[in-house]
A protein has these predicted regions:
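Flexible, solvent-exposed loop segments that connect beta-strands
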Residues: 33-53, 82-109, 136-157, 186-203
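Transmembrane beta-barrel architecture of outer membranes
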Residues: 24, 59-61, 111-113, 156-162, ...
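Outer-membrane beta-barrel "beta-signal"
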Residues: 22-26, 31, 163, 169, ...
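Periodic glycine anchor positions in long extracellular repeat architectures
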Residues: 133, 162-164
Length: 216
């Protein structure tokens, strides 16, 4: 409930701010470097299996934002339909009847982010802004386990911080660009499978983003 109230409060702020500012819409190409690590504890033996996985992918996203003409402060919402965070397999051989290949796979679905770009200075002729954001994602598990067990999907929050620059493009008064480098740390995913095994996983994301927008 506290998470939902926080998101509603941020949405209210974005809506109120946008009524007093210039609007912008655009698309982003982002190179994501995802780092995931976790452990699975089996119910029957208590064995702990640790693992980690890195994944790199270029993923598009769309955004709409409100830009204050006086201060340059920008608040907005971005959306990614789906983001694959990779898969990993292992092969076990034991006497409990569940020997075989185990494949863990997951996606981040419906990635919504509420963010603020806060002007913080300049580097030469390039203005610099600090990005602060909150993401809401659905972790959809797509595992293929020889034991037949499944893990539930979970909704998580991610907290983003980054630096960027922006400016007008020379192709018209209404076109602009943004370049950003961001870091996101997601809440810990914890779940118990249908077979009683427990998994705990942490996820981090570093992204380099290039955006093109249109102001109106």
């Amino acid at each position: 409930m506290k998470k939902l109230l926080s998101i509603i409060s941020l949405l209210f702020f974005v809506t109120t701010f946008s009524a007093k500012a210039e609007m912008g819409i655009g698309i982003t190409a982002a190179a994501h470097m995802v780092d995931g690590s976790g452990s699975e504890t089996t119910r029957t033996s208590g064995q702990v299996n640790n693992g980690s996985h890195d994944e790199t992918a270029v993923i598009p996203e769309v955004f709409v934002e409100a830009i204050d003409d006086n201060s340059g402060l920008t608040v907005g919402i971005s959306y990614i339909p789906v983001r694959d965070i990779g898969s990993k397999s292992r092969t076990d051989s034991n006497s409990e009847g569940d020997s075989g290949t185990y494949k863990a796979d997951a996606e981040l679905n419906n990635v919504f982010q509420i963010y603020a770009d806060i002007p913080t200075g300049s580097l030469g002729s390039f203005p610099i802004h600090t990005k602060l954001g909150v993401q809401r994602v659905t972790v959809e598990t797509l595992e293929s386990l020889n034991s037949g067990s499944e893990y539930p999907n979970r909704d998580l929050l991610g907290f983003t911080v980054g630096l960027g620059t922006k400016g007008d493009l020379p192709f018209g008064n209404n076109l602009y660009y943004k370049g950003e480098l961001t870091y996101t740390n997601f809440e810990t995913y914890e779940a118990v499978s249908t077979a009683g095994n427990k998994v705990v996983a942490d996820l981090e994301d570093v992204a380099a983003k290039l955006s093109v927008g249109y102001k109106f």
